[in-house]
Amino acid sequence: AIDCKTVDAALVPCVPYLTGGGTPTTQCCSGVSSIKTMAGTPQDKKDACNCVKAAANRYPNIRDDVAQALPVKCNVQLDIPVSRTTNCDAI
């Protein structure tokens, strides 16, 4: 099962990148990679998606364009969008 606290902890190092752009830190990309590892099953993906969405909604100044580029910048094939508006049931 996915624990949102774990997802939150993984994303915290990404907040400066998500709000300002530039290049994500190694710690941020490690967190993105760990979320991918956690989300092994379709249900886990949905749960992780909801955690990511909830985390994104706690930071109103996250830039959506930057957030969507995060997996690419980290070179992680993440099937979960980093967005405040994702329909997690559609994943």
Curated annotation (Swiss-Prot):
Function comment: Plant non-specific lipid-transfer proteins transfer phospholipids as well as galactolipids across membranes. May play a role in wax or cutin deposition in the cell walls of expanding epidermal cells and certain secretory tissues. Binds to both saturated and unsaturated lipids, with the highest binding efficiency for linoleic acid, followed by linolenic acid.
GO MF annotation list: lipid binding
Record PROSITE patterns: PLANT_LTP
Biological processes per GO annotation: lipid transport
Pfam families to which the protein is assigned, alphabetical: Tryp_alpha_amyl
Keyword Transmembrane helix annotated: no
Name used for this protein in its record: Non-specific lipid-transfer protein 1
Tissue: Expressed in seeds (at protein level).
